Amino acid sequence: MIAYHADHVGSLLRPSGLITAREDAAASRISQARFKAIEDRAVEDAIRLQERVGLPVITDGEQRRLSFQSRFAESVSGLGDWDLNAFLWGHWHGDLSTVGDVTIERPAGLGVVEKLQRSRYLSVEDFVFLRARTTCTPKIALPSPSLWANFWSAQSSRAAYSTLESFLADVVDILREEVAELVRIGATYIQLDAPHYALLLDPATRSFYESQGWSAERYLERGIEMDNAVMGDFPGVTFGFHLCRGNQGSRWLASGGYERIARTVFRRVRAQRLLLEYDDARSGSFEPLKEVPEDKWVVLGLITTKRPHLETMDELVSRIREASRFVPLERLAISPQCGFSSSVIGNALTPADQERKLRLVVETAQRVWGEATRTATN
């Protein structure tokens, strides 16, 4: 198992030139080849940033993604028409003077309309590109399969899939094939992003899934079973599992501690590293960490990606010591609380803010553990 005391969730701010190029490519103002070259350069810059601050885990910054989950929708047919709001709907809360609350409605026509057919792998090409450009450990993030329950509709999807369960079974198969191919070509660290579980703390979100025929409790239990099916049994591969409460334009969807889901998620999910959000009071206490079994690490997301304010190292060290009351220090790590840009709409920080926060991750790990990186095999 990979054992790093410094980690990060994955996404980084998109350069303005990349955002403009994406719009230009969509409008056919530039060629796809030109857009690909701009994407490649953005990924290379993201890699250099992570290496510069000393991170042992390197991602492509998700520079090629519209959203952290969009690679799936881009790689299969059958989902019908969708846009960015398919991944963003909900009531978003803001706490900055310049970032207020906003509500994004669920697109009325959203829904799988045909049997899913994979047209390409989601992230295999991205991994090959990334691995060729760094000597550090490359990490690829994939969406949790049950996150796609959002795309099944009782009104428009029954002709393709009579039940939500049958739809998600095909999602699991596609993601399981993706993981198997990534492992075959050499991936050793794969992360599943699962923000929807913590969102079950929110009454509106619970109500939506119950309207689809699944209670929140069943959704959580079956969701973890699906996650475990995707991760499978791959010796030598470390799986991360990221839980947050929504991260978009410096806003969030839900508040509350992990108490209601800790026993099910922390104990039953097959992942070896739990990347948890703990950047402010709305994240709750460390008490739920008592449910973490001895074969798992906890990556404490203590450094916020939502605000430019830079935490002090003393503050971070104190919080790590507090968490060590529930999980031994040697099985803890530190990271930012979430990505810096879970979609092309990044958080309200500058690239300089982002770099300072990533550097603080590494420096804090060095202070607490004497090193930011360590690789071990158990």
Which stretches of residues belong to each language-model region?
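Domain-level signal for soluble alpha/beta catalytic cores
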Residues: 1-378
